[in-house]
Swiss-Prot record:
Homodimer. The RNAP catalytic core consists of 2 alpha, 1 beta, 1 beta' and 1 omega subunit. When a sigma factor is associated with the core the holoenzyme is formed, which can initiate transcription. Belongs to the RNA polymerase alpha chain family. Residues 248-329 are annotated as: Alpha C-terminal domain (alpha-CTD). The N-terminal domain is essential for RNAP assembly and basal transcription, whereas the C-terminal domain is involved in interaction with transcriptional regulators and with upstream promoter elements. Its EC number is 2.7.7.6. DNA-dependent RNA polymerase catalyzes the transcription of DNA into RNA using the four ribonucleoside triphosphates as substrates. Pfam families: RNA_pol_A_bac (PF01000), RNA_pol_A_CTD (PF03118), RNA_pol_L (PF01193). It comes from the Bacteria. Residues 1-234 are annotated as: Alpha N-terminal domain (alpha-NTD). It catalyses: RNA(n) + a ribonucleoside 5'-triphosphate = RNA(n+1) + diphosphate. This is DNA-directed RNA polymerase subunit alpha. The gene is rpoA.
Length: 329
């Protein structure tokens, strides 16, 4: 293992063991000693509390006025139905909310596959049971699904909504996180002669709406973005000081004498009040040839000297002369 003794090993994604459709074990190694718990705890907290996802937030059931009631012909009471709806695993593409509808009649289970929805909505667990109908009865409901993150209890949303919310619109505790369970374990790892390293094993159970590897990647991105301010050691709200670019190339502000022209050429330019290189480059060949005592030989000399500095005659300079030179002219 090469490198400086002060360099930190960087972990890599070693293995993803898919236990079942919703559970996976992700192993990362090698890590410096102590970093297994440092990173494992940080990723665990982010995966549980900060991962975006979709959840049922509101339900309207025909014939039901409040959650502390029951519906004839339905085996479960309303509270149990709401609890079952919380287990619905849904994804929404291209928007932040969607309205789903469910209508079912006849004895038997009512499952997620019975829900009608748009093409931008995907129900990951179509076999999920919502309730059971008995006899020749029916049930109809409208289900609102929203995108969010974290856990938002119904009581918190009820306080922010208007008092004129229609009777029968039932609010549901929304758990937006697609991660249902997360645990991590730190084991010993070895790289060549070093045996004091950590291996981080993350055991994750999701609702099936996110791939375990993608969940790790998203949580790590969130953590990195939060640490950016510490890396820069400054307030991210402070405006960055932009370096002001000079209005003119500094060479244009230098006196004509710096061109080291012959005495004849220099005197001719001074007679025409051409004191700075910026004054000179704005003149054309025709204008200079009209200058007394300045012939073609002097003109050729001036053109060659300017060309050696990347300049030429006939240039246009906006806002010339600058204020710093205007006072001297």
């Amino acid at each position: 293992m090469q490198g400086s003794v002060t360099e930190f090993l960087k972990p890599r994604l070693v293995d993803i063991e898919q236990v079942n459709s919703t559970r996976a074990k992700v192993t990362l190694e090698p890590l410096e000693r102590g970093f297994g718990h440092t990173l494992g705890n940080a990723l665990r907290r982010i995966l549980l509390s900060s991962m975006p996802g979709c959840a049922v937030t509101e339900v309207e059931i025909d014939g039901v006025l409040h959650e502390y009631s029951s519906k004839e012909g339905v085996q479960e009471d309303i509270l149990e139905i709401l609890l079952n709806l919380k287990g619905l695993a849904v994804t929404i593409e291209g928007k932040d909310e969607a309205m789903l509808t469910l209508s079912k009649s006849g004895a038997g289970p009512v499952i997620a596959a019975d829900i009608t929805h748009d093409g931008d909505v995907t129900i990951v667990n179509p076999d999920h049971v919502i309730c059971h109908l008995t006899g020749n009865n029916d049930i109809s409901m409208r289900i609102r699904v929203e995108r969010g993150r974290g856990y938002v209890p119904a009581s918190a949303r009820a306080q922010t909504e208007d008092d004129d919310r229609p009777i029968g619109r039932l609010l549901v505790d929304a758990s937006f996180s697609p991660v249902a369970r997360i645990a991590y374990n730190v084991e010993a790892a070895r790289v060549e002669q070093r045996t004091d390293l950590d291996k981080l094993v993350i055991d994750m159970t999701t609702n099936g709406t996110i791939d375990p590897e993608e969940a790790i990647r998203r949580s790590a991105t969130i953590l990195a973005e939060q640490l950016d301010a510490f890396v820069e050691l400054r307030d991210v709200t402070e405006p960055e000081m932009k370096e002001e670019k000079p209005e003119f190339d500094p060479i244009l502000l230098r006196p004509v004498d710096d061109l080291e022209l012959t005495v004849r050429s220099a005197n001719c330019l001074k007679a025409e009040a051409i004191h700075y290189i910026g004054d000179l480059v704005q003149r054309t060949e025709v204008e200079l040839l009209k200058t007394p005592n300045l012939g073609k030989k002097s003109l050729t000399e001036i053109k060659d000297v300017l060309a050696s500095r990347g300049l030429s005659l006939g240039m246009r300079l906006e806002n010339w002369p600058p204020a710093s030179l205007a006072d001297d002219l």
